Amino acid sequence: MEHLFESDAYMVRQKVMKILGEEFHIYSNESMQSMIGYSKMAALKLKEDIRVYSDESKSTELLIIKQKGILDFTGGFSIVDGQTGESLGTLRRKGMKSIIRDSWVLMDQKENVVGSLGEESGGLALVRRFIPYLHILFPQQFHLRVNGARGTVKYTQKMNPFVH
């Protein structure tokens, strides 16, 4: 799984024109020369169970992201190493705060907060929730901040009518 975390930049492409479910290809950079991960999610599930594989054959499972509860307002997700079964931590939604703009906390194996993930603009986030298709003109942007680390990681959507 090490190669999944070795890159400084990633490109995640999502197939949009799928009838049921979602499919993602993860590349080590924007040139998309080397695919380092693949995920296919089923539609209409009560609990999310996201599996990231090394490629489309699904022969090597790298990462498991599993929703903890069915009706969990705080949206806890366990993150597990697909090779060893070792817990890597938890990603938990900040309930009420996420109504206006998406906010998450990152926790280690012992449930200690080690970082945060949050939508960049509260104003745009609120407007996006009430005006359909505004996300096409103003895509979501997130910042990941890890406690004790310098700088942040920025996630930006790039809109394309067929993939993003």
Label each region the model flagged.
Residues M1-H164:
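Intrinsically disordered, low-complexity proline/glycine-rich segments
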